């Protein structure tokens, strides 16, 4: 049983007499009343055991739409294969949004299967895949879950590309206009290095440790495409499904406006002092989850997002031309560019600053009114790009000839694969090949790990 606080206890006294003894008397205020009067939301301690997962609904929604665009998934065998394994790719978000994607819980530490679309978050990330246990001294500490990859996969989920580089154009624009020159690890490392002083200043202002801020989202997609192709050529439906299922997550990140922007958590040049503290916060603090989680959840509950998304996928006209893994990475750059054009990150941040102080019951509708329809559009485009990448990898690996379309891959087989850090290994930006025409399915881990023994 999971207990939640329901009141604020202000104090307790005991009244006593010689006949009936002492009787406790406490003064408490119902949390719902207090929060309503103070116009506040209940937020759990960020250091508490994480018993829920943010941000999975959108990824699963895009994954469920994978076989929908039949103008892109032209192979009947591929459509059959996808439909037969769809529940392993992505669960169906219900109206209550009560699907539970956690690997383990304190109540039941037995590892559970996680649908592939959110394995990159819910299994591989160290800040998600853990439970809190007590040590011999009774102190809480994190116990990592099976399959966790520390922070090695985190940079594959984002890429802050919308800052100027070598002139007035953003690095994203340069990648769109001349991918042969800029869409490679060396060029990206040079771009991030040029921003070191700026990144360091922002980190110092917010009291964070310095980091390289390396993002590698399109390169991860390139790698997964090549793994899918190799798996199809080898007649390996398990690896094909594992790689292609986790691919859903990264394509989903690419069509979320804030995942490829330096404004992902707010404008780092616009900060405030946290009330009652010396800590500095972004003025738009909370915008990422406010947009990607709360607004999307509101759309599902109140605006029939699932139905509208399915309709938009079918009616979409985006048809990226993809033959190789390099083409897939270029498609991701194009997807990011179109997404930010339709839903500019700056607009999201500005709107959030405008409405963040109002009640959640008013804030979510305000965000939806501002961005709901456009968000359905970019999610639908993401689903169509995902379908095009799947079809291209299937064709490149002769899936029609090599993969049994009727095979149903078991959850146990998929868990064995995604819990193995050597399968679709998560590597850093400087570990991706310089040659876009190389076989990126051959990427190996360079560092040893106890689990490799």
Where are these regions (language model features)?
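Short alpha-helix carrying the canonical HExxH Zn2+-binding catalytic motif
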Residues: 240-248, 252-254
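N-terminal, motif-rich segments that launch catalysis or mediate targeting to/interaction with membranes
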Residues: 6, 10-242, 260-380, 391-453
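Internal, helix-rich recognition cores of eukaryotic regulatory domains
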Residues: 59, 254-255
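Divalent metal-coordination and catalytic microenvironments
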Residues: 59, 249, 386
């Amino acid at each position: 049983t999971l207990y939640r606080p329901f009141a604020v206890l202000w104090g307790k006294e005991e009244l006593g007499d010689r006949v009936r003894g002492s009787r406790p008397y406490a003064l408490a205020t119902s949390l719902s009343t207090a929060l309503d009067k103070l116009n506040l939301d209940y937020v759990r301690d960020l250091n508490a055991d994480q018993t829920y997962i943010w941000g999975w609904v959108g990824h699963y929604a895009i994954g469920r739409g994978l076989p929908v665009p039949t103008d892109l998934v032209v192979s009947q065998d591929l459509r059959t294969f996808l439909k037969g394994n769809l529940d392993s790719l992505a669960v169906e978000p219900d109206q209550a949004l009560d699907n539970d994607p956690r690997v383990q819980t304190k109540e039941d530490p037995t590892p559970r299967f996680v649908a592939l679309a959110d394995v990159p978050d819910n299994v591989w990330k160290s800040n998600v895949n853990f439970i809190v246990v007590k040590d011999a001294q009774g102190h809480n500490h994190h116990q990592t879950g099976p399959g966790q990859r520390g922070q090695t996969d985190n940079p594959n989920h984002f890429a802050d590309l919308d800052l100027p580089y070598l002139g007035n154009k953003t690095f994203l624009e340069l990648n769109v206009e001349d991918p042969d020159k800029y869409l490679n690890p060396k060029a990206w490392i040079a771009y991030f290095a040029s921003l070191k002083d700026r990144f360091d200043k922002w980190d110092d202002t917010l009291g964070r440790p310095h980091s390289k801020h390396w993002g590698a989202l399109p390169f991860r997609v390139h790698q997964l495409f090549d793994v899918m192709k190799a798996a199809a050529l080898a007649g390996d439906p398990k690896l094909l499904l594992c790689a292609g299922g986790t691919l859903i997550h990264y394509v989903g990140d690419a069509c979320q406006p804030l995942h490829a922007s330096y404004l992902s958590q707010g404008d780092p040049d616009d900060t405030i002092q946290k009330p009652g503290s010396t800590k500095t916060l972004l003025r738009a603090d909370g915008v990422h989850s406010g947009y990607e989680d709360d607004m999307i959840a509101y759309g599902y509950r109140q605006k029939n997002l699932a139905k509208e998304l399915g309709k938009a996928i079918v009616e979409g006209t985006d048809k990226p031309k993809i033959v190789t893994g390099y083409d897939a990475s270029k498609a991701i750059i194009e997807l990011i560019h179109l997404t930010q054009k339709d839903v500019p990150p700056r607009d999201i941040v500005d709107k959030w600053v405008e409405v963040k102080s109002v009640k959640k019951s008013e804030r979510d509708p305000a965000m939806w009114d501002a961005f709901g329809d456009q968000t359905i559009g970019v999610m639908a485009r993401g689903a169509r790009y995902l379908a095009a990448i799947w079809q291209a990898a299937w064709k490149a690996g002769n899936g029609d000839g090599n993969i049994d379309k009727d095979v149903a891959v078991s959850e146990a087989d998929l868990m064995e694969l995604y819990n193995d850090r050597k399968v679709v290994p998560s590597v850093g930006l400087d570990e991706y090949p310089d040659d876009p025409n190389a076989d990126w399915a051959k990427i190996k881990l360079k560092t040893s790990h106890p689990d490799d023994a």
